[in-house]
Amino acid sequence: MAWYWWRRRRRRGWWKPRRRRWRRRRARRRGPARRHRARRRSTDPNAPRETPRSKKKRPKKTQIQQSNSEDSSPGSTPVKKQKTKRRRYRRARYKNNFSSSSSSSDSSESSSSPLPKKSSKSGGGTASTPYYLPMHKQGLYV
């Protein structure tokens, strides 16, 4: 019939949850260590704590509220600081939007005057500043 040990185990109510033994749990809670701690604790509120504290230190709520509402009036809620979004494709914008004819003319103009001029020739490109070569490559074209 049931030659295999795993089949026999399954038939004996494996789906029923086991009963918890409450007596043992309560006995653990009421151990001698807990009574010991309660006895040691001093009544003085300014005395240092003997019980171990958690390693994470939480900032107190009163300190947070004071720091946020320094400038604002007491009735108003503190203003949230917004993080500025990073512009991801700033450098790529200038590399892709220039035409070869305008960049060569801009580079010749910029050598005579210190400020870069806005060229009207840029064929519909939205880039206002010309593309400059890196320092180690500039010697090739001058």
Curated annotation (Swiss-Prot):
Polar residues bias spans: 62-76
Superkingdom of this protein's organism: Viruses
Biased amino acid composition, Low complexity: 99-117
Basic residues bias (residue ranges): 17-40, 80-94
Location of the region described as Disordered in the Swiss-Prot/TrEMBL record: 17-142
Listed name of the protein: ORF1/2 protein
Organism of this sequence: Torque teno virus (isolate Human/Finland/Hel32/2002)
Upper taxonomic lineage: Viruses, Viruses incertae sedis, Anelloviridae, Alphatorquevirus, Alphatorquevirus homin3
